[in-house]
Structure formats: structure tokens, C-alpha cells
Amino acid sequence: MKKFSTLVAITLTLSLFLVSCKEAVEKKQNTTNTEEIKEPKKPASVVVFNANLATESDLVALGFSAEVVNKLLAARPFLSMSDFTAIIEGENTEELFKKIFVPLNLNTTEEKVFKIIPGVGDKMAHEFEEYRPYTSILQFKREIGKYVDEKEVARYLDYVFVPVELNTSSEDDIKALPGIGKKMTHEFLEYRPYKNLAQFRKEIGKYVDEKELNRLERFVYIK
């Protein structure tokens, strides 16, 4: 009887041990499965403000003092990055350019200037220059897409533009210009053919003020 009781005790202990092991394995598997189906957190997208279009509240949120904000608003439009940086002298431009910028003309900007774009080094600045002249932003995306992924190409679009020929550029090319919406694109097309930039200023000047007209003129040319 004593041997039988001992055998029962051993059997019960072994059974409890096996059940415990099984539960531990199942728990580990469930934890692993849960970890596997979790999607990695995507980094928050960074908004890059156009220095010519950022609102007063945008500029304040970027950390500019009231004095600098007033100077920036009064000096716009900035027709080059040097015009912009002259006002923010003393600021941490390396960090600021990740958040605010004056888009660069892909066909006329010096190669060395492209390197002030965050994340653009010697090699990429060379590639930007290598494929000139650009006739459309689509061409830029296609050529630079040989070297970086689609997401990185899209990021570059906050920092550059391709000027458009007023009489021949497509509607999509015009809409790709910084700060050009559907309505203004329509007006650009409406007054074709343009004989000269004076005509462009006269017609488009019906819809925007002098400052905005100066900003828009930077994006266009006539053959």
C-alpha cells in the first residue's frame, strides 16, 4: 500500500510538472505571436515649411523670436536661400533647415548649395546637377529615384523645384510648383500664349498682390 501511495504521488507530481511546462510553452508562443503581429511604429512625418508661405504662428512655433518673425514677414518673398539666411543669422541653421526652407531651382542652383539640404552630401548634390536640365519634376523623381527610395525622393521635393515654361508646361508640372494650387494653375493656363513676362505679371497680378507675384515669377520662364 505504501509503495502504491508513493507511486501515485510520483505520478501526480509528474503530471503537474508536465502541465506546468505545457502552459509555459503556450504562454511563450502566445507572447511571440503577439510580438510578431505588432507593426513597427512609423516615425512621425516632418513638416518642412516654405519660408515664403509659413504663417506668423508657424514661425513662432519654430522658435523664432517676435523680432525675427516680423523681419521675415516684412522681407518676403525670399528669392534665394541667402536672402533668407541673412535674416536668421545666428540661428542653428542645420536644425532649422529640417523644418523651414526656400526651395532651390534645380536648373540654376550651384552644386555646393544643394548640400545645405538636410541629408544631401557630395554624391547626391552631384547627381542633382548631373541630370540638368530638368524639364519636369517627374524627370527629377525618375532620375534621382535610381539612387534613393521613393520616400526619400518625396522628401527632396520640399527643398527643390523645376521651373516651368509658361506656354508649354503641363498642368501637372505647374501644380507641382511650391504653393501653387488648382485655381492658380488654371489661371496660368487661361492666359496662354504669353508673349513675355510683363504679360504674365499683368494677368496673374489680377489675382495676387505684388509680393506673391514676385514669388510666382521665380518659377516661370518663356522660351
Describe each model-derived feature in a short phrase:
Residues 1-8:
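Bacterial N-terminal signal peptides that target proteins for export
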Residues 22-24:
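Bacterial signal peptide processing site
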Residues 65-66, 121, 181:
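Small-residue hinge/turn detector
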Residues 71-108, 124-167, 184-221:
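Accessory alpha-helical DNA-binding modules that contact the DNA backbone or grooves
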Residues 58-63, 114-118, 174-178:
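Short amphipathic alpha-helical boundary/capping segments
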Residues 29-52:
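Post-signal peptide N-terminal segment of mature Sec-exported envelope proteins
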Residues 49-54, 104-115, 164-174:
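Disulfide-bonded cysteine-rich modules in secreted/extracellular proteins
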Residues 17-20:
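C-terminal motif of bacterial Sec signal peptides marking the signal peptidase cleavage site
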